[in-house]
Amino acid sequence: MSWRSPQPVSVAYREILEQSYRGELSLLQAALPSRFQPSIQACIDSLDSIMSLPMVLLHRDLTSSNIMVDEDTCHLVSVIDWAEAEVCPFGLNLDTLEMLTGKLHRRDGWIRYEDHAALHTGFWDAFSREVGGLSEQQIKLIKIARMLGLLLSRGFTSRLADQPKPVPIGDDETGRYNTLSLDGFLINPQTKFDVTG
């Protein structure tokens, strides 16, 4: 488990990463609608603490199409497409849990699968058991890191290695599609992230 095997990084690396996140969050503050401002501000306010989380190798494009599962056993076989992987604070790609336990409709937004609550409870119980000794405050911080990861991925245009430099989303097809995820996970009371410990 990556939490127990953090990657060694220099103080300078952490500082550069934090400056990058701060700059990108500032861009989102200027570009995204007001309904997202409380979430952006919560990430800014927690950024110093987020940077104290274990630094781990994160798959930055962890989607259902990049996860290979054995059809008969439903066991994980492999994870592909590591081109955008980077060392970041733990939790920045946990928004993937939402995307794997629900589906996005262009008209209705995010809809959770019937077993969503059981899957999430199972994940957090297993994680807490494996890691051991996490306080409610640490779990809350991980959940805010998840929100930061969502904003950095869905608040911007594509971050793929072969694409132009990402910019905040706008009122185009990509922007509207990503806004559905931001609304679903940050605003909609039925599907928004739980950020409590």
Model-flagged regions — what are they?
Residues V87, T96-G197:
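Helix-rich C-terminal or lid/interface subdomains of diverse kinases
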Residues S49, L53, T63, A85-C88, ...:
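Short, solvent-exposed segments of well-ordered alpha helices
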Residues M1, S20-G23, A42, L57, ...:
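Alpha-helical elements of Rossmann-like donor-binding domains used by nucleotide-donor carbohydrate transfer enzymes
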Residues M1-H75, N188-T196:
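An alpha-helical support segment within catalytic cores of ATP-dependent transferases
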Residues S34-Q37, C88-G91, A117:
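Alpha-helix initiation and capping sites
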Residues S2-Q7, I80, G102, V131:
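Protein kinase-like catalytic domain
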Residues S65-L94:
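Catalytic activation segment of kinase domains across protein kinase-like and atypical kinase folds
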Residues L57-H59, V79-I80, G149-F156:
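Short beta-strand segments
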